[in-house]
Amino acid sequence: MEFYIKYFNRKYNLSYDILRLSNPYGVNNLSKSLSGIIPTYINNIVSDNEIKVYGNGDIVRDYVYVEDFIDLNLKLLTTQEKNNIMNVGSGKGTSISELIKKIESVVGRKARIEYLPKREFDVDKNVLKITKVRDIYGWEPKISLSEGIKRTFHWMKGLK
């Protein structure tokens, strides 16, 4: 996809910004099925359903709160800087075990966890380097993972 976008830039002089997004989460996810690990884990813990963890919980991912991502998009609309490819995330890694502990703390309930064999296709660590978006646009995420989980939980609680 990025190849085609760059091609149209060269051929038709169309400007672009490509954002490579980590794992977004947050309020107003209106899909009927829960998508994303954070709302799924919140729902499972609240409902006392088991959480499936592949491996021992040491897989590390990068999570970005949706409002931070929206703020960046609004900033991109109002700037002259164009034609960049950037990673968008928190730039911080959180293991699945750490994530579960943070959610348990917010929800006030212990998770029931089913540990399954690690899947071959799971990458051990995926944390985005956000230096470029910080340097070019002065953007950094403002909402911590703990605060984002709290906001997501309270929003989900209001839907029930």
Q: Predicted segments — roles?
A:
Residues 95-107, 148-152:
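PAPS/PAP-binding and catalytic site of the sulfotransferase fold
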Residues 69, 73, 88, 99, ...:
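Non-catalytic, hydrophobic alpha-helical segments
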Residues 26-40, 49-50, 54-58, 66-67, ...:
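Glycine/proline-rich active-site loop of Rossmann-fold NAD(P)-dependent oxidoreductases
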Residues 2-6, 10, 39-42, 71, ...:
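Conserved active-site helix of classical SDR/Rossmann-fold NAD(P)-dependent CH-OH oxidoreductases
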Residues 96, 117-132, 143:
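Active-site loop of classical SDR/Rossmann-like NAD(P)-dependent oxidoreductases
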Residues 1-17, 22, 45-47:
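Active-site Tyr-X1-5-Lys
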Residues 145-160:
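Amphipathic terminal alpha-helices
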